[in-house]
């Protein structure tokens, strides 16, 4: 399998999980570095510059939430949270703090491997875009969107988006004015098929994060609108 030696940082206080993931991910071609707590994770992140972080929530010294917050201050690196079975609050909190996806413990290593592949592919390969913008720069009111460079500027100032946030925006602007259902968004952006029964609040949280970064008034959005009973749409205010 050709992966070009992407580097994964696995952060978990359980040594058995670290060893299993290090072995499995190394076998399929990734370079793996590990950390046993949040403080060590931040140190290793600065030293190793990984391409993706797998991050447990409950850890000593600094929990996964704290690590996620610190990483998001300086990086848009893909983050997958490991959360406890049935603990919906953990999942939502992690997403609100900037995680891109989550996997519920106990998990199948194959499931995590699939999520890693999907997240790296969708955040680092613009050719997978579902948009019809043909790589052009878009000016939408006070927003400038550079499709090729995957960058967004608001009133001339660059806004930091995670890879998944940009992919979500890219999908919405591909058919401006047309609503996308949450199921459509989950499939197009995250690669989740309907039979997976993924909590659709993953979409809601990412929409909320996008609004907080792009809208002039996030509580009364003009761009990313809710299509009641359906999902969300992007409205071109330049028209």
From Swiss-Prot:
Residues 7-120 form the Response regulatory domain. GO terms for molecular function: phosphorelay response regulator activity; transcription cis-regulatory region binding. PROSITE patterns: OMPR_PHOB, RESPONSE_REGULATORY. GO terms for cellular component: cyanelle; cytosol; protein-DNA complex. The keyword Phosphoprotein applies. CDD domains: REC_OmpR, trans_reg_C. Residues 76-94, 135-236 bind DNA. This is Probable transcriptional regulator ycf27.
């Amino acid at each position: 399998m050709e992966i070009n030696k992407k580097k994964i940082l696995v952060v978990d206080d359980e040594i058995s999980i670290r060893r299993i993931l290090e072995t499995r991910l190394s076998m399929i071609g990734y370079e793996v570095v590990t950390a046993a707590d949040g403080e060590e994770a931040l140190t290793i992140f600065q030293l190793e510059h990984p391409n993706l972080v797998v991050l447990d929530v409950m850890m000593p010294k600094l929990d996964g939430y704290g690590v996620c917050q610190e990483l998001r201050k300086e990086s848009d690196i893909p983050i997958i949270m490991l959360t406890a079975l049935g603990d919906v609050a953990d999942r939502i909190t992690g997403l609100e703090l900037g995680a891109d996806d989550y996997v519920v413990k106990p998990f199948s290593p194959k499931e995590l491997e699939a999520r890693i592949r999907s997240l790296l592919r969708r955040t680092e390969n613009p050719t997978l875009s579902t948009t019809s913008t043909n790589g052009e720069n878009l000016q939408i009111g006070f927003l400038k969107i550079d499709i090729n460079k995957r960058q967004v500027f608001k009133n001339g100032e660059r806004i930091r988006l995670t890879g998944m946030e940009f992919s979500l925006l890219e999908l919405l602007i591909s058919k401006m004015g047309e609503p996308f259902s949450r199921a459509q968004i989950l499939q197009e952006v995250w690669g989740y098929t309907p039979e997976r029964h993924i909590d659709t609040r993953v979409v809601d949280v990412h929409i909320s994060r996008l609004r907080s970064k792009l809208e002039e008034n996030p509580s009364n959005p003009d761009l990313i609108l809710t299509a009641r009973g359906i999902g969300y749409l992007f409205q071109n205010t330049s028209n």
